[in-house]
UniProtKB/Swiss-Prot annotation:
Residues 8-19 have a biased composition (Polar residues). GO terms for biological process: protein catabolic process; proteolysis. This is ATP-dependent Clp protease adapter protein ClpS 2. Binds to the N-terminal domain of the chaperone ClpA. Belongs to the ClpS family. Residues 1-24 are annotated as: Disordered. Signal peptide: none annotated. Gene3D superfamilies: 3.30.1390.10. Involved in the modulation of the specificity of the ClpAP-mediated ATP-dependent protein degradation. InterPro entries: ClpS (IPR022935), ClpS_core (IPR003769), Ribosomal_bL12_C/ClpS-like (IPR014719).
Length: 110
């Protein structure tokens, strides 16, 4: 091999480098289910109102969830990232306390 070939940067020469692009993988955030628990004291209409106000459910969807809670003891209001789920639970609990209802709202990892 002559000196000219080494200076030209041939693919097998010492000046060869490989550039690779690494695309970082973005991890999806964990999701949490927001659940309402049944009790014997909170009026059904109040539960429907909570679902409309805090979870943007229409009357039909809110009523369906409320009846599920009434018959099964628990019902899912929505699935959110941690911060949003935590905020929703706090809002519902504060609203229920303000209106003197024992309604319970919890979150669990999906």
């Amino acid at each position: 091999m002559s000196n000219d070939e080494n200076r030209s940067g041939s693919p097998t020469g010492p000046n060869t480098s490989v550039i690779t692009k690494v695309k970082p993988k973005t991890k999806r955030p964990n999701l949490y289910r927001v659940l309402i628990l049944n009790d014997d004291y909170t009026p059904m209409e109040f539960v429907v109102h909570v679902l409309e106000k805090f979870f943007q459910k229409d009357v039909e969807a809110a009523t369906k969830i409320m009846l599920h809670v009434h018959h099964h003891g628990i019902g899912e209001c929505g699935v959110f990232t941690y911060e949003i789920a935590e905020t929703k639970v706090t809002q519902v609990m504060d609203f229920a306390r303000k209106h003197q209802h024992p309604l319970q709202c919890v979150m669990e990892k999906k």
